[in-house]
Regions:
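Flexible "cap/lid" loop of the alpha/beta hydrolase fold
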Residues: 175-182, 190-218
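Conserved HGGG/HGGXW glycine-rich cap/lid loop of the alpha/beta-hydrolase fold
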Residues: 87-135
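Conserved alpha/beta-hydrolase catalytic His-Asp/Glu region
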Residues: 202-207, 216-272
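Active-site loop/oxyanion-hole signature of alpha/beta-hydrolase fold enzymes
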Residues: 127-168
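Acidic catalytic loop of the alpha/beta-hydrolase fold
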Residues: 284-288
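Alpha/beta-hydrolase fold catalytic core
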Residues: 16-97, 163, 332-340
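Catalytic histidine-centered segment of alpha/beta-hydrolase-like enzymes
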Residues: 311-324
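Short beta-strand/loop motif that positions the catalytic acidic residue
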Residues: 273, 279-281
């Protein structure tokens, strides 16, 4: 079974030049030396690094349109790292307890639109676009292994001065949240897992998974609605502007070798996580089921679990109000009096 799951995962994700001076005749006269346009921008605006490739224009437009769904103030932060630019959407009061959001595969940080207003009311929220997926983070060079990916996140946490914070991860972001917590146990205050993929159990191949696989191999826009019906109990509830952004993202996505490393965590690894952990899954979830809840209860020392009614894998959208309430209740119960 695990080899089938691995096979599924393999398939599912298929400088400025120096100043130049030229002598040109303009209407019979010598033209003045011209400054390189990029150099001018750098001198006028300081660090000018917001480069957008022509192929990304359509996606960026869709991303920005989806951001209009965020019914709360935000600003976009670009953090320079050794591996490229980290794009982070920041919301909430500056003195609020920090929350770091890790989105699902190819979903980008815009997926949090039904949750961000509630989560950022009293918390400082940092939604990070994954470096290896469609989004506004931009990779430079190569990320060789998961430890380098961890280094990328550590650079972000350090620059944001996040000493103690809560991780909230959805789907693939949930798996990643556990990975980060295993490397940074002292830094992670709480973990919230929203139907984490391949974290407690192997994904069971089936007809619904086959539909997702078929779409991934040939991501046609007309097929997307049917695929999303396997992930959501009410696709019509999902905002069209987000679906458009997600559609373009799935067409842009390339295979990541790190998918092969997304295997369920061992009993010892899960048992070593002593911070409070909240696990929520949908009752119509094709990624997780009651076995995930049972394993979380058995192995995580301080866990809280919940099965959300009338929700699929996209439970943060299907039942956003219920999910938001459960998350905030969990955070309130596990609030520390000490400053972060």
């Amino acid at each position: 079974m695990k080899y089938i799951a691995i096979l599924f995962l393999v398939l599912v994700v298929i400088g400025c030049e120096n100043d130049k001076k030229s002598n040109q005749k303009v209407i019979g006269q010598q033209a003045e030396n011209q400054t390189d346009p990029q150099k001018q921008l750098e001198e006028e605006f300081g660090e000018y690094n917001e480069e957008v490739k022509p192929d990304d224009l359509e996606y960026y437009k869709a991303y920005n349109t989806a951001l209009k769904l965020w019914k709360t103030p935000f600003h976009e932060l670009n953090v320079k790292t050794s591996f490229g630019k980290a794009h982070i959407i920041v919301s909430g009061p500056k003195n609020g307890e920090p929350l770091v959001l890790l989105h699902g595969m190819n979903a980008s940080s815009t997926m949090w639109y039904p949750n961000i207003k509630a989560l950022s009311q009293n918390h400082r929220v940092y939604a990070i676009d994954n470096l290896l997926e469609p989004g506004k983070s931009q990779i430079e060079g190569e990320v060789k292994d998961m430890m380098e990916m961890m280094s990328w996140y550590n650079e972000i946490f350090d620059q944001l001065k996040l000493e103690k914070f809560t991780l909230i991860g959805a789907s693939k972001g949930g798996w990643l949240a556990i990975y980060i917590a295993l490397q940074q146990k002292a830094r992670i205050k709480n973990i919230v897992l929203l139907s984490p993929a391949q974290t407690f159990m192997w994904i069971n191949p089936g007809s619904e998974m086959l539909a997702n696989l078929t779409y991934t191999l040939a991501p046609k826009r007309k097929r997307l609605h049917g695929v999303m019906e396997t992930m959501s109990v009410d696709v019509d509830k999902i905002e069209n502007s987000y679906i458009e952004q997600y559609s373009i993202a799935t067409q842009k996505a390339t295979f990541s070798k790190f998918i092969l490393q997304m295997t369920p965590y061992s009993d010892n690894e899960l048992n070593s996580l002593t911070m409070p952990v909240l696990l929520l899954i949908g009752d119509n979830d094709i990624i997780n089921n009651e076995k995930s809840i049972e394993k979380a209860k058995e192995l995580l020392p301080h866990s809280e679990t919940g099965m959300i009614k009338n929700a699929g894998h996209f439970l943060s959208i299907d039942q956003s109000e219920v999910v938001n309430k459960r998350i905030l209740q969990f955070l309130s119960l596990n609030q520390e009096s000490s400053p972060h």
